[in-house]
Structures are given as structure tokens and as C-alpha cells.
Amino acid sequence: MIIAVDGSAASGKGTLAKRLALHFDLAHLDTGSLYRALGLHLLRSGVTAENAEENKAAAAVASLDLGLADSSEIRTDAVAGMASVIAAMPAVRSAFTTLQRDFATDPPHGGGAVLDGRDIGSVILPDADFKFFIDADLEVRVDRRTRELQAKGQSVIFRDVIEDMRDRDRRDRERTTAP
């Protein structure tokens, strides 16, 4: 069984995906964490959102330490911003597409998988057995993200979270690959 959970930033798709995976004893992949891990890797290498080059970012996928996807460091605004920028790059999306499809069709412990991310149901797994699209009002998503960051001890300015969320939504809507 393959389940795809798609949706906007901070809409709750990760929470739903984790609960489905636990309930049905399926492997889970938060595909956004892959982009965040690559974003963290690039930031550590001195690359910024302003100077990120598509081919270099895509090439970095092959040598990416996937353990970074489990790091708490990927949940910062800087990493989220970088992830949003590189996620708009067709070569980066292509590099991750194979990895995500392989995970879905051959999950770590067999039995099926739940994948969540922004284009999982439409692009990565269009033939998934079950597909969900999760969305919420901007205010609800900003509140969720603010509480998440505060719970991690980060100083948060509500206005900055709103601006960041609007910017991410705009980049997601306007990207030519998997908007």
C-alpha cells in the first residue's frame, strides 16, 4: 500500500502522514526533510539562497548524508528558505524524484509506505493507492509554525513567520516544476 499526503507548508500533512504510517505499520518519508537536508548541506558549504546554482545543488543530492533529514537543524527558517529555493529547481526535483519513488515501491521494512510532501500525489506518486491533499488558512499555518519553532526554543517574531509563509507559498505557486 502506498499513501501520498500532499499539501501546503505547515498544513498538518506531516502529522497526518506519521499517524497513518503508525496506524498501518508503514514506512514513512517526509520528503520535505530531504529538501531541507540538502538546504542545510548547501548552507554549511557556504551557498546561500541568493547564489545557489541548480546544477551544483542537483549534483549534491548524490552525496547527501540522508541522516541530516533527521537533524533538528533542518527545522530553522534559514534552512526552510533555502529548501524552498532549491525545491523550485527542476534538476534538484528530478534528482529527488527517483529516490522518493524507490522508497515508495521498496520501503525499508516492506509492507508499504506513506510519503508526504508538496507534489507527492500529483507528480511523484500519481498512482498511489490513496492520496490526500491537506490545506489550512494562512493564520492557522502560521500559528502551527510559530508554536513548532517556540517549542524548539527559537525566538519567533509572528510578523516574520507570516512573511516567510507568504514567500514560501508564492514560490511554490510560481515554480514551473510541480507548482
Report the location of each language-model feature.
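ATP-dependent small-molecule kinase phosphotransfer cores
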Residues: 34-113, 122, 139-143, 147-151, ...
